[in-house]
Amino acid sequence: MIKITLKDGKVMEFEEGIKISDIAMKISPALYKKALAAKIDGETMDLMTELHKDSSLEILTFEDEMGKWALRHTGAHILAQAVKRLYPEVKLAIGPAIDTGFYYDFEADFTFTPEILEKIEAEIKKIIKENHKLERFELPREEAINLMKENNEDYKVELIEDLPEGEVISFYKQGDFTDLCAGPHVPSTGKVKSVKLLSLAGAYWRGNENNKMLQRIYGTAFTKKSELDEYLNMLEEAKKRDHRKLGKELDLFSIHEEGPGFPFFHPKGMIVRNILESFWREEHTKAGYQEIRTPLILNEALWHQSGHWDHYKENMYFTNIDDGDYAIKPMNCPGGILVYKNSMHSYRDLPLRLSELGIVHRHELSGALHGLMRVRCFTQDDAHLYMTKEQIKEEVVGIIKLIDKFYKLFGFEYFVELSTRPEDSMGSDEDWEIATNGLKEALDSIGKEYRVNEGDGAFYGPKIDFHLKDCIGRTWQCGTIQLDFQMPERFDLSYIGADGEKHRPVMVHRTIYGSVERFIGILIEQYAGAFPTWLAPVQVKLMNITDAQYDYLKKVEETLKENNIRVEIDTRNEKIGYKIREAQLQKVPYMLILGDKEVEAGKVAVRSRKDGDLGAISLEEFIEKIKNEIKAKTN
C-alpha cells in the first residue's frame, strides 16, 4: 500500500500502481468529471500516471492554472492533428500552451487563410467528438529519430537531436496522430469542449531571424462554450481598448521603424508619464525611501560579478569604450548595490530604502515586441532595500501595503503569487528557506491570500508577484518583491552590528509599476483612453460659439492656467456640436462652452465627459469643483 497526501492534508491509502484518475474518482465522482491533470510532489502529470510510492497529490481542474495549461496543450495537439488530416504534406514545428490559449507553428507550401481556418476548425470539432484517448509512450533516441523521419517531420528530428544524451524522449498518441511531447495532457480529446482558432502570424523557427519563416496559428480552448463566448467578447472589447490604436488617436506616443521597441513619447504622453512618476516620488518619500540614479552603461565585469552574465547575457546590449567591454544595463540592481557599497553602514541605518526610476535596455526578439507592453527600452520603478534578517517581515509588509495603495488608486483588483526556488538558482538551501519563509510570514501576517507558484522564483531568491486584473478581466503581472541573499554575498555587502562586527544585510528588490511604459499601456486600456481628471493630459477643452466670445475665452484660459488646470482652446470656425464631438473623441473630462449668454453672465457652460450637460456656473465654482476632483484623485 502507498500513502497519498491530498491538498487539504488528508492521507489516503491505495494499492501501488493505482492511476491518478482512479484516485480522483474515489475522492469524488464530481471531481473526477472535472479533473484535467494532477500535481504529484509539485510536478504536473497526466491523470493516467500510475503511482508507486508515497506522494502528495493535487487534482487539477480548469480553475487551476496548470489544469488550464494541460487542456490548452491538448488543444494544440488537436489543431496539429486536424491540419495533418487535411494537409498531410504540412510539417509540424512546435505547439505549446500559452497564457491565453495555444499556438502551433507549421511549414506549408501554401498560405493559411481565414477560409482554411474554418475548415480546420470543423475538423477539430470532429476530433473532439471522436474522443480519442491521449496515450504517452517513450522511445530510445534512435527509435525516436527514426519515427519522426518516417513521418517526414524534420523539425521534430532536429528537436530530438538537440536533446541531451540520456533525456527521456516521450510522445503522445491520439487516434491516428502522434506528436513529440513532454506533456502533460488531458485524458482524451473529448475533454476539450470548446476550441476557437483566433489568428495567424509569421514566426521564425526557434525565434531566430536567420531561420525559416513558419506559419503560426493561434487558438484557445475551454471546458464550456459559455466560457469561450465570454472570452471572445473580452477580445472584442480589448480591440476597442488597444493602447496602440488609442495611443495614436490621442497623440500619446508612437513607435517608428527607425527604433523598433523604443517608444517615442509625445507631449500629451509625457504629461501622463510625469504625473505617474511625480506621484511615485511623493509616495516613496512619505514611505521613507531615498531616490538615487545610476549610469546606463557599466563595465562588463560588474555583470559577471552580479551573475546576470550567466543568466541574462542573451538579453543584453554591449559596447566598447576605450578598449574596455561595457554593457547597457538590463537591470538597475548592480548599480544600486555600488551606491550602498560606497559608504559604511551601521545597523542603526537599516532598513535602508533606495529607490530609482532607472532606464533599462533588454533585447527582445522583433516578433515579441508589442506597443508599450513589450519594448526594448523602459523605465523600471525599482527600489532596493537593505535590512537585517529580523526586519524582513516588517519591511515586506510595508512594501505590500504601498503596492496595495497604488493599485487601489487606479481601480485595479489584483491577486498575489509566491514563486519559489527554480532549478537554475544560486545559494544554499538554508538561505532559500529563510527567504521563502520571510515572504510567507509577511503575507500571512496581513491576511493576504496568495497562491504558490513552485519553481518560478528569480535565480537569486524567491519572489512575490502582483497580478493586476483590469476592467475586462485580463491579468497583468506588474509589481514584484524579491528577497535576495545572493547579491550581498557576491558584492561582499556589510553593515556594522550592535556587537561592532561586520554582518551581511538582506536585500529586497521591488517594483510597483514594473515598467512605467507598460503601466501606461495598461492604464490606456483600463480607462479606454478616458483618463480620470487628475491624470488626463488635457483636463478642460475651452470652446467659443462665435468670434464674439474670443476675448472672454482667453481670459478664462488664463485663469484656468493660473490654477494649474491643463486646458486647450478650440477657436476654429466650426459648429459647436462638431467641436464637442471632437473633444469627446479626445476623451477630455470637461468641456467649457462660451456663448453670448455666458459672456454676459460671466459664467461658463459645463459639459462633463461622464455626466453630460451640467449647466452654466461661475468660473470660480468650476475651478473649485475640478481642483477638488484632482486633489481626490477620483477615477
Curated annotation (Swiss-Prot):
Residues 1-61 form the TGS domain. Keywords: Aminoacyl-tRNA synthetase, ATP-binding, Cytoplasm, Ligase, Metal-binding, Nucleotide-binding, Protein biosynthesis, RNA-binding, tRNA-binding, Zinc. It comes from the Bacteria. Residues 242-532 are annotated as: Catalytic. Zn(2+) binds at residues 333, 384, 509. Binds 1 zinc ion per subunit. SMART domains: tRNA_SAD (SM00863). It catalyses: tRNA(Thr) + L-threonine + ATP = L-threonyl-tRNA(Thr) + AMP + diphosphate + H(+). It is found in: Cytoplasm. The keyword Zinc applies. GO terms for biological process: threonyl-tRNA aminoacylation. The keyword Cell membrane does not apply. It holds the Pfam family tRNA_SAD. One of its GO terms (molecular function) is catalytic activity, acting on a protein. Its cofactor is Zn(2+). Its EC number is 6.1.1.3. Belongs to the class-II aminoacyl-tRNA synthetase family. Catalyzes the attachment of threonine to tRNA(Thr) in a two-step reaction: L-threonine is first activated by ATP to form Thr-AMP and then transferred to the acceptor end of tRNA(Thr). Also edits incorrectly charged L-seryl-tRNA(Thr). Homodimer. This is Threonine--tRNA ligase. It comes from Clostridium botulinum (strain Okra / Type B1).
